[in-house]
Amino acid sequence: MKYLLFLLCFLPLQALCQDVKVIINEDFGLIYKSDTLYASLVANGDTIFISDDDVSWHLQDLLRFQNQTLKEEGIYIRYPDIIAMEIEQIATLLDYKSEVNYKNAIKNERRTITFYGPITLMLRKSHTVTIKKCTLVIENNKLIKYHCSYCQHDDVGIPTENTKFEYKYDEKDRIVKIFNKGKLEQTISYVEQQ
């Protein structure tokens, strides 16, 4: 048994489902600039801050460094903008589905929505990540943070120029359908927790 556990320690990290905590703000700007928080990010390797600049770090960096103590200068892992935008669109479909909900929202009301995959999102032209579950936290009708668990990161993806994603929300069946150029690519189920 001990020998088996020893071998498991050396399995490729990509083979395991890892949790990724993501904190965003409405304009996808950098939220925290504190050296202390960045140091925490480096030490824990489990929180990614979305940036609106052109730094293109990939989830592979998170997998590579999550169990290591990095040097003080650290590596700032940035979540690619494309995933932020994809999840933002899904959140919009789930939460802003009617004007009534928007107009009648209670000030500072916080709601949590969880959707289930697997859903494959595109990082760049040739990188994808497969998410198994994503929980959105919405406060006062704004997506304030989400927490995703992903199972796979691939170097083979769909080129950007060949994609045109459309999202269709089905309130009755509690699913979101994702189409690419009119063809159904994926179906996401979700639950809503009031």
List where the protein language model places each region.
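Bacterial Sec-dependent N-terminal signal peptides
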Residues: 1-20
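Buried hydrophobic residues that stabilize the cores of well-folded domains
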Residues: 18-194
